[in-house]
Amino acid sequence: MNNNLISFNPCQDVFLYFDDSSLKNCVDIDIKEGVDTVVFDGGNSQISINLRNVNKQFPDVKTIVINEDVIEINISNFMFPNVRNVVSHSQYFYSGRYLISSVYFSDILKNVFCIKPGENIEEITVDTIEDYAFEGCIETDGFFSGTMSYDFKEKAFAGSAFLNLPSRNGIIAKNGVIFAVDDDATEIIIDELKDAVHKWTGVYSMPMDLDLKHVKKMILHHLDNAESMTVFPETVMITDESYDTKIRRNYCNILNDKRIKNFEAKPDSQSFTIIDGILYSKDGKYLLKCPRGKTGHVSIPEGVKTIGAEAFRGCMISSVSFPDSLTEIQSNAFSCSLIQKIGFGHGITSLGYYESHIFSHCNDLIHVEIPSNIETIGNGTFFSCKNLESVKIHEGVKWIRDSAFAECDNLRSVELPSSVEYIGENSFISTETLKVDSAFGGLLYAFTGSYAVNFDVKKLIIKDKTYYLPLVFNPKQQYLLNRCNKASEFPDRQFYKDAACTELKQNTALYLYENHIDDSDEVKKYLKRSSKQIAYRLLDLNKDDKLVKFIQLGLLSKASLNELLLSSREKNNASISSYILEELDKFSQSTFRL
């Protein structure tokens, strides 16, 4: 025992040792031989008993008493192998045969202790079974009746007799519970449970992170068994004939492990077929699911009409080509995938509708070319494709719906064809320059409205006329401009005064002035009036390069420069202080010459 630990005696002949003076974290224990009851307490609130890594054993203890201030207990079954009674005065634990905690309305089995064959057993009725809960347990009967489902941690049965049960079809299972995979299995079959208890569900309980060891192939006779799993082998054969229906009900995320590289089907399947490891409906018209671990190019065969929702979500393919027969791509079909190149074919006319997000979060996309056969780009189709740099939209596209290209931070410039009649709200909100053939309704709501960009103004080009717009308009002016339906209706003026806030007004005016777009007296006078405020803002934001450029414009008075010098020194900004001194010296030289 570490002599630096603090001892506490909760009951006769029991000594708990804490590593803190407040007695909140118990890390060691001693119990005299013959003691059959141990009390967990520390005399303070919020006590944690952390003894799992303490290699001591107290076989005489039959009862554990948990006082009201104990909130956490981590112990090994081997420390108290013969405990058969838990008495709890804490709201975080139950009294009973086993150690069961209650956390956020979830009951967690932590310890059954080392139960021997033939002992009286109580059925497990909890939500979750913790790692090592059955460690050292020799009995395997009576715990599970098959009437409940559980959330098993990966090592729930480690060190128990459950793992010594005989395997069948590569799995070790009993009473509707899969405990482990056979060490030597390369193929496993998870069949459909058909006993009296499970006939309505056909589903096992099993650890979510079931260790597949050397398994290369899994045969699933009931798809719902996959809902409990997060780990799969590289090949999955599905014999569940209801799979087609379940996929169409958006169950496809249950087979979304990137380790899956191929799907297989029964040769006589009535529901689906396999082409190049990808799952299709039996008639080949509906692409249901691509294995997430599939790589390289995918050429979807002619005859396919629909790509299902999330069919390629998170996939590792690099490119795809669509057949001319394709008429529908459902929501999130390619979302979060590693796709780099898309061949749209000549058949499809719409990339989704109102809930699209077909290619959202595809961060390997650099360039996209939208062909003339596509009329509609649906909501969020390319939302948050962070590395998308260029988009070529051909004549023929008519509608670009809400957020279609929103949060594409590297898409700095887009030119729309004259066929475009409508662009939805926020569709180009992250784009710096937008070129259109004519003004039309919705233009301002689509293009402006975000502060979260790394440039100062928006550039709207209508025909050959460039307008420099604030990032965000005041609502009234945005509404009025948004109603312009042709180029002649769009006001021929500067818009810095229409910005939503003072900072954006200043940024827009400054951009116009320093780039010689508008260096009129009106803009210059406005910037002079605002010069001190602008300078202090840039100083506070540590935007030294911008501040230097602003000082070079000569808009700050000598008095303002002196005040700015004091502020820069207070902030220990030596480079700005030095530059201001140089500018003040120019003032002195100019005065002397006069």
Can you describe what each PLM-predicted range is?
Residues M1-E72, F78-D131, E135-E154, A158-K174, ...:
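Structural signature of tandem-repeat unit edges
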Residues S567-S568:
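Solvent-exposed segments in extracellular or luminal domains encompassing
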